[in-house]
Amino acid sequence: MKLLQVMAGARYGGAEEFFVRLALAFERANVDQRVAVRGHPFRKKQLSSGGVRTDTFAFRRWLDVRTNFGLRNIIRDWRPDIVLTWMSRASRACPKPKLGRDFVHVGRLGGYYKLKYFRGCDHLIGNTPGMVDYVCGLGWPAECAHYLPNFVSERRAPPLDRKILNTPGDAPLLLGLGRLHENKAFDVLLDSMAFLPDHWLWLAGTGPQEAALRSQAVRLGIEKRVRFLGWRDDVAPLFSAANILVCPSRSEPLGNVVLEAWAQHVPVIAAASEGLQQLIDHEVNGLLVPTGDAPALAKSIMGITGARAEALAASGWASYRESYNEGTVVS
């Protein structure tokens, strides 16, 4: 079986990171594959160094003749059995169906998208049951909608030395990961820090809200206890150094960072947004708080200590191993 994967994603993002992990896992499983991506040099290096045959295209929003022509040539000459397009732009860029075509077009959703971008697909994949229910509710045939979760790396690493980031070794350390975007609600996490005078926060990510978040930290008087780390590919040392992973998102289709925390044996507290409610079993493998409620978030954070923290981390690891490990997803 020949598989062509097409990803027109941004420079940074959870879906983009999982795309790379899945492509490398397929390569290790000896899947005959080829990928087409935007020309981000670091992503091409990640894929090529893992042995993945990689083509790059611009994937512009409109009138991108070169990308369309290039994809048509790959499909015509390489003749894949399956074309897996990631999210809306790649799905829209895939050559339109033709009578007698000899590949199956599968679209992978990264959120609650409009179905108009996926009209050329034969099947759709959602990474949560709720996403599958969503597309079926819009009229997509249930027999052509499939649930396939993500997986993350289980690689452990020694903790990043807190001294490097001028963080006390004995302070309770919170970790936030993701794009600095309104949907991620890191402003709520910063507000909660005002109720947590002994806690420190490492915030790893980039995005349009970075300047506003930095200003907010100063306004709240917590800037000395908050470290903005930028986008980090080496998250394992961050997890090893942290005490709690906080995911305060207002909107979160899945929550890759929760899976990463589970795989790294770190307890999780998250806002009860749609995908996170489906992922987390409250008081078992994590804690859920109302979205946008900084005092409630702070109160729950203060309650994750000692044996309770250890129990949440252990249950999270068990959930990851049961349903979200590489072997289960790839097979």
Where are these regions (language model features)?
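Short hydrophobic beta-strand element within catalytic cores of glycosyltransferases
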Residues: 36-37, 267-271, 280
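Short His-centered aromatic/hydrophobic patch
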Residues: 64-67, 85-91, 109
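A short, well-ordered alpha-helix in the C-terminal region of glycosyltransferases
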Residues: 310-323
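A conserved nucleotide-sugar
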Residues: 30-33, 171, 186-227, 309
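Conserved acidic donor-binding segment of nucleotide-sugar-dependent glycosyltransferases
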Residues: 282-283, 287-294, 301-307
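A conserved mid-protein helix/loop that constitutes part of the nucleotide-sugar donor-binding site
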Residues: 13-24, 172-195, 208-214, 295
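Aromatic "clamp/platform" in nucleotide-sugar-dependent glycosyltransferases that forms part
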Residues: 231, 250
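Donor nucleotide-sugar binding/catalytic pocket of nucleotide-sugar-dependent glycosyltransferases
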Residues: 122-158
